[in-house]
Every structure is written in C-alpha cells, then in structure tokens.
C-alpha cells in the first residue's frame, strides 16, 4: 500500500512537471534545418507562434561564440502569422545555438533553443 502511494505521488509530480513544460513550449516552437551541414551553410529557422493578443516581438539568433547573426520582427498580436521563417545564409563552421525569443506586451520573454552543427570542409566544426 505504501509503495502505491509513493508511486502515485511520483507520477503526479512527473505529470505536473511535464504539464508545466508543455505550457511553456506551446507559446513558441522552433524548427531548424538542416541540423548538420557543411560550411558555408544556409540555415532555415521556422518559428511557430500561436496567435495571441499579447504577442509583440519575435527575435531569432544564431550564435557560435565566434559568429553571431540575428533577426527580429514585430508581431501584431492576433493578426500575426502563425509561422515566421528566418534564413541565415552563409554561416561559417561552428556549433550554433539557435534561439527564438517571444516577447509579450508586458516585456515577459519565452525562449526556445536548438543546436545546429556547421562543419568545415574538413569535417570539423
């Protein structure tokens, strides 16, 4: 009986934690292609932001530490497109963190990140 209660408690905690994460990622999702490519690489970033009156800004950035590129657009709340596409052309080799930051009308931010590997012609980042 005691083990069932412990199992139920762990399951409940896990579901609450998972639900919290799901809510956060529903505000914005990110698809980056290709995940691995050769330099110079053209990377396409598709940010999906559900329409909401509070959405104001979307910033997407690619950062390898040695190279940085970003782009931002203003969102028109419920009239903004569901999917916004960004292109980062001719990225040099490196391991990039691609991040999308959604800012609402109160200045609160939601961030999602992906990793992209751009290899040199010798097969190294």
Model feature map: region roles:
Residues 88-94:
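Surface-exposed, short loops/turns at beta-strand junctions within beta-sandwich domains
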Residues 45-51:
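Aromatic/hydrophobic beta-strand junction motif of beta-rich domains
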Residues 102-113:
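Short acidic/polar inter-strand loop motif in beta-rich domains
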Residues 20-43, 123-125:
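Short, compositionally biased P/S/T/A/G/V-rich stretches that sit at domain boundaries
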Residues 76, 115-123:
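Short beta-strand edge segments in extracellular beta-sheet folds
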Residues 94-101:
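A short tyrosine-centered beta-strand micro-motif
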Residues 78-85:
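Aromatic sugar-binding surface patches on proteins
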């Amino acid at each position: 009986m005691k083990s069932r209660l412990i199992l139920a408690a762990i399951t409940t905690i896990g579901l609450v934690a998972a639900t919290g994460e799901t809510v956060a990622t529903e505000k914005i999702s990110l698809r980056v292609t290709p995940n691995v490519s050769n330099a110079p690489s053209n990377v396409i970033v598709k940010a999906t932001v559900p329409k909401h009156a509070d959405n104001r800004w979307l910033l997407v950035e690619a950062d390898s530490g040695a190279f940085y590129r970003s782009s931002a657009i203003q969102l028109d709340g419920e009239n903004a497109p569901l999917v916004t596409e960004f292109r980062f052309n001719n990225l040099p080799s490196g391991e990039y963190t691609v991040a999308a930051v959604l800012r609402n009308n109160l200045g609160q931010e939601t961030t999602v990140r992906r990793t992209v590997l751009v290899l040199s012609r010798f097969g190294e980042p």
